[in-house]
Amino acid sequence: MGEQNKLYYDVEKLVNSLQESFDLDCAQSVSLFTSKSRSNEAWLEELENKFKLKDDVELDDVENLRAEIDMKLNMLEDKVSYYERLYKELEEFQNEIKIKTVVNNRRQSRTPI
């Protein structure tokens, strides 16, 4: 029985040692986590003071303004496209008039007056 008691005592001692080591590791982890959490909270507070967030009304106003600008930009793009097409048509018309003028001048120069 003496050897069994010693074995039981050694196992109990080993379990206690492991428990102490585990408890120490847990305490260190909790301490590190707490320290980092506090550091992150301080950093977050610093960022909040440095960069003020816009409230929902201001964000909605910005979004509405962006939508309005997009709409105006689309209208301008449509107008530019229209004027580009008009320019091409006028250019074609001008070329046709030049050709007709040349043809008409040749025709008039051939007929005796």
Swiss-Prot record:
Alphabetized InterPro entries for the sequence: BLI1
Broad class of the protein's primary localization: other
Keywords: Coiled coil, Endosome, Transport
Any GO CC annotation of this UniProt entry: endosome
Coiled coil feature spans: 57-97
Highest taxon above the source species: Eukaryota
Subunit structure of this chain's protein: Component of the biogenesis of lysosome-related organelles complex-1 (BLOC-1) composed of at least BLI1, BLS1, CNL1, KXD1, SNN1 and VAB2.
Task of the protein: Component of the biogenesis of lysosome-related organelles complex-1 (BLOC-1) involved in endosomal cargo sorting.
Family: Belongs to the BLI1 family.
Protein name (record): Biogenesis of lysosome-related organelles complex 1 subunit BLI1
Organism: Saccharomyces cerevisiae (strain JAY291)
